[in-house]
Amino acid sequence: MARSLKKGPFIAHHLLKKVELLNTSGKTEVIKTWSRASTILPMMVGHTIAVHNGRQHLPVFITDQMVGHKLGEFAPTRTFKGHTKSDKKARR
């Protein structure tokens, strides 16, 4: 179920402060965050945000096509190593 329009998009306060600070100063630096549930807003376009995937921070460059999506969508948490060649059950 989608979030109510009355509430507006969710974004962590600390992340919003950091983005606003970078926008006013004009600096370009990587913002580290653990907030995968934060929605990407138009003010974030052009910034690089390092999103935590449970093990490390993956840098994500924000483009205008990403607006409205969540940060966690662009930092995968699981890596598939592949099935072993002799595993008969996985090959069925």
Curated annotation (Swiss-Prot):
It comes from the Eukaryota. InterPro entries: Ribosomal_uS19, Ribosomal_uS19_bac-type, Ribosomal_uS19_CS, Ribosomal_uS19_SF. PROSITE patterns: RIBOSOMAL_S19. SUPFAM superfamilies: Ribosomal protein S19. Keywords: Cyanelle, Plastid, Ribonucleoprotein, Ribosomal protein, RNA-binding, rRNA-binding. One of its GO terms (biological process) is translation. GO terms for molecular function: rRNA binding; structural constituent of ribosome. It is found in: Plastid, Cyanelle. GO terms for cellular component: cyanelle; mitochondrial small ribosomal subunit. The keyword Amino-acid biosynthesis does not apply. Protein S19 forms a complex with S13 that binds strongly to the 16S ribosomal RNA. Belongs to the universal ribosomal protein uS19 family. PANTHER family: RIBOSOMAL PROTEIN S19P FAMILY MEMBER, SMALL RIBOSOMAL SUBUNIT PROTEIN US19M. HAMAP family: Ribosomal_uS19 (MF_00531). This is Small ribosomal subunit protein uS19c.
